Design a protein with these regions (language model features):
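Glycine-rich, acidic and aromatic/proline-enriched surface loops and short helix-turn segments
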Residues: 1-9, 73-74, 226-241, 271-275, ...
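Non-catalytic, structured segments within soluble enzyme domains
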Residues: 1-167, 327, 334-337, 341-342, ...
């Protein structure tokens, strides 16, 4: 009844601004329904006495997707300009999968934290008892709310634990304990907690698996991207550990050396040019002159070992540097560069053999999309963050043409139940005959 009363004058009868007027109009509709036998008088009177039951539309802000939405914003701004982006009421559709996004960000942060922790504890942010300006020091850290870290101060140090209290002004202060097992990584060679942690120390904490854990803000950073290899849709993207501190997107903006992640491109180019899985490549010392006055270039395998004549397949399986360089030397760098350009990894790179080991820089999103043809049967994809843009009238002004191949990513089994193969840990294929 309330909705039926609104079309005549939506602003005048706005129930949020003018509840009494809106209620009067609603009751008028209810009365008309009763007068025309669409509603009993008893029900009509009961409804008239009821209060306006309003539910505001909930606007969801997905903090986990800050990097993703910022990249979309930058893209739309580059295409349509600042004015159209912010004043024309554009509706932008993306292929973002919030579940994938949440897990991707979680995985990225865990990887960065684990790497940083392996390099040891660098000490507290500051000490409240020793530094009068401790609040200034603490205010330098701006945390993304999805981290769910608390700021804490040590109130006592014991042999097997430390007691703390949170000091975050925006949250209710709580007291708790960090057990010895969650402090071990901070101690290193120092066995006593008292040698590392002191009363008044301030640091970050987080509750994990019902136990409080000490947190260290990492000095390293990274990015992660999840692509649909069949359509190119970007399902998840996180450009860094903490968006509040740095909006720099390490997926699309940072150029890094891919290293061994580039080797499959070298091997793919070789397969396109006559190499086979059983082609024998020499895994032995390799020396290349870099010119007058420069040291010779001597690449090495991981572990600094040589394995002699080895099949092409083994080279990619074990990521052998020397075999990869020899393949590049035999094949020729122009062929590798040609495939790199086709896959949009590089535009131009110097023709140096070190490029075959991933010495040239590229972005994570370009490298990831280059792997898609290995999955989808050889189809090149373009990473897609925007699938459609509509103006304020609902007219589509942009439509992504890379339609998803329906069913291409589904596993098809026409034999009913999946076969149950007993794991006997025995090798059933001979390498000498299986790849002829």
């Amino acid at each position: 009844a309330l909705l039926a009363a609104l079309p005549k004058a939506p602003s005048k009868y706005n129930p949020y601004k003018y509840p009494e007027v809106a209620k009067f109009r609603r009751n008028l509709v209810l009365q008309n329904l009763a007068d025309n036998n669409f509603l009993s008088k008893k029900k009509s009177n009961n409804f008239k006495e009821s209060k306006l039951d309003l539910k505001k539309r909930r606007i969801e802000i997905v903090n986990e997707a800050n990097s993703y939405t910022e990249e979309v914003r930058r893209t739309v701004k580059d295409i349509y300009g600042f004015e159209k982006l912010y004043s024309q009421g554009l509706s932008i559709s993306t292929p973002l999968n919030i579940d994938y996004q949440t897990q991707a960000l979680k995985s990225l942060r865990k990887g960065i934290e684990d790497y940083d922790r392996r390099r040891g504890w660098r000490g507290p942010i500051t000490n409240k008892l020793k530094n009068k300006n401790w609040e200034t020091k603490v205010s330098q850290y701006k945390l993304d709310p999805t981290l769910k870290w608390n700021l804490a101060e040590i109130i006592s140090v014991e042999d097997k634990k430390i007691k703390f209290k949170t000091i975050d002004k925006k949250q209710k202060n709580i007291e708790g304990v960090i057990p010895f097992k969650n402090l071990k990584w901070t101690l290193r060679q120092k066995k006593l907690i008292q040698n590392v942690h002191q009363k008044g120390d301030i640091f970050f904490i987080k509750k994990e698996k019902n136990l409080w854990n000490i947190k260290q803000y990492p000095k390293v950073n990274g990015g992660i991207v999840v692509l649909d290899p069949f359509s190119g849709n970007v399902l998840a993207l996180a450009g860094g550990f903490n968006f509040k501190t740095s909006e720099f997107n390490r997926v699309t903006q940072a150029k890094r050396q891919p290293g061994s992640a580039f080797k499959p491109i070298v091997y793919a180019a070789a397969l396109e040019n006559g190499f086979a899985p059983n082609t024998i490549i020499l895994d032995a010392p390799f020396v290349e002159s870099q010119g007058v006055g420069l040291k010779n270039w001597k690449p090495e395998n991981y572990g600094k070992k040589f394995y002699g004549p080895t099949t092409f397949r083994k080279g990619i399986e074990y990521s052998r540097n020397l075999m990869t360089v020899r393949i590049a030397k035999i094949l020729g760098l122009p062929e590798i560069l040609k495939l790199s350009k086709e896959l949009n990894i590089y535009d131009e790179i110097p023709e140096l053999l070190s490029m075959s080991l991933g010495a040239a820089e590229t972005t994570l999103i370009n490298l990831t999309s280059a792997y898609a043809p290995f999955v989808n049967g050889g189809k090149k994809i373009t990473p897609t963050l925007i699938t459609r843009i509509q103006d304020r009238r609902g007219k589509t002004i942009f439509q992504e043409k890379n339609r998803k191949c329906k069913g291409c990513d589904k596993f098809v089994n026409n034999r009913g139940e999946l076969p149950k193969i007993e794991n006997t840990n025995k090798k059933v294929l001979s390498e000498e005959t299986a790849y002829q």
